Design a protein with these regions (language model features):
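Substrate-binding cleft of carbohydrate-active enzyme catalytic domains
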Residues: 1-97
Length: 97
């Protein structure tokens, strides 16, 4: 999160005003023995509705993300949370096949 906060400050300095934050992604199956079940996938935002969906190896809490959005607003940067589907939705199918 500290990287994103610093990025917003730098963007503001350079008069950039929109940041897409990519919240889900997955690897390519050919790098995981051509097996989708072994392919890395993650959803990086805390979900109380679907608690098993949130990545175990690192994620943003709702409060943390809201604070980040408020900071960005102070610097004139709009945060657009990006949920990339259907292309990078392996985290969803791992959660609920």
């Amino acid at each position: 999160m500290s990287y994103l906060r610093n990025l917003v400050k730098m963007m503001s300095y350079y008069k950039m005003n929109t940041l897409h934050v990519h919240l889900n992604d997955n690897g390519f199956r050919q790098f995981f023995a051509d097996d989708w079940n072994k392919t890395q996938a993650a959803f990086r935002l805390e979900s109380t509705t679907y608690p098993g969906l949130t990545a175990k190896d690192g994620s943003y809490s709702k409060a943390e993300f809201i604070d980040f959005q408020k900071l960005a607003e102070e610097y004139g940067v709009e945060i657009i949370p990006e949920i990339d589907v259907p292309a990078h939705s392996l985290a969803f199918t791992h959660y609920k096949p």
